[in-house]
Amino acid sequence: MKKRMKKLVAIAATAAMVASVPASAVTTYAAGDDITIGVSIWSSTDVLGSQCKKIIDKAAAALDVNVMYVDQGHVSEQVTASVEQLCAAGCDGIVICNSADSEMTSAIQTCEANQVYLTQFFRIISEENSPEVYQTACNSPYYLGAVHEDEVTNGYTLVNL
């Protein structure tokens, strides 16, 4: 059972580089249970998206989990619809690259209603600019966290190259 949960957490961590799972959000899986991770991504076929897909696919194969992709083009309606689609498809967790903080309220609520774990990659909810959305995420047992690049430092470094 613990091995299957470790696989679920590991694929989410690999895909989104998530460091931890809250203790209250741990679900056990029996041996032989299939785990499916949904990936809501802007595009799985462009240069960056295809490389992300390759990494996620390799991690999924190594961990013996299934992956389902929905390309949402960073269109708000498609981002929120992708979460609904992945939940309806029976995903155990979703890794999302959303385009705006406002989309995360709906995504979190959908995941809570379906008891599906959710994490962000390449994005993070702004505590300063979106305090209500940030608090919704903090209060959710299904929101696992986010990993993103340090855009300020990256910009500074690029300017100084």
Where would I find each of the regions flagged by the language model?
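A residue-level marker of the well-folded mature domains of exported/periplasmic proteins
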Residues: 2-7, 13, 25-161
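Hydrophobic core
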Residues: 13-21
